[in-house]
């Protein structure tokens, strides 16, 4: 089974992906963690690295192509990333997580150890803007078009365990009634 988990920064995609990976024993690959690691390796903030990637498509395309290649050759995998629902066309379940910006910013401040919410907001909004432009330019993908997703969940009011249970119900149903991935 191939599952994609996508969403904007701070929506909980990495947490949910880890949960599902552990629950089902699936391999997990994460574009966000790869991107953050690359930014760190270049001694750059995320927004700064995003601007670099905006100027040189090789950064995004390398990460996206690698994720797609691994996913298409693997069974029982969770692919986490903003574009994974678009890139892994043969996924059995495509999930989009969302949450209000205030909720996402609180999570980002905690996760990335950013000094305050206003700084996190500036960084996050710039990152989202840069990414939306790149996705449109590189792949003709509108990140706000959720039509490829099978399951769209608001992560604001549920912790990862509760979200995991909702998704597990969908996975269990898919296991009972196999169908061709769309």
Curated annotation (Swiss-Prot):
Its EC number is 2.7.4.25. One of its GO terms (biological process) is pyrimidine nucleotide metabolic process. ATP binds at residues 7-15. One of its GO terms (cellular component) is cytoplasm. The keyword Ribonucleoprotein does not apply. Its main location: cytoplasm. Transmembrane segments: none annotated. Pfam families: Cytidylate_kin2. Keywords: ATP-binding, Cytoplasm, Kinase, Nucleotide-binding, Transferase. GO terms for molecular function: ATP binding; CMP kinase activity; dCMP kinase activity. It catalyses: CMP + ATP = CDP + ADP; dCMP + ATP = dCDP + ADP. HAMAP family: Cytidyl_kinase_type2. Belongs to the cytidylate kinase family. Type 2 subfamily. This is Cytidylate kinase. It comes from Methanoregula boonei (strain DSM 21154 / JCM 14090 / 6A8). The lineage of its organism: Archaea, Methanobacteriati, Methanobacteriota, Stenosarchaea group, Methanomicrobia. The gene is cmk.
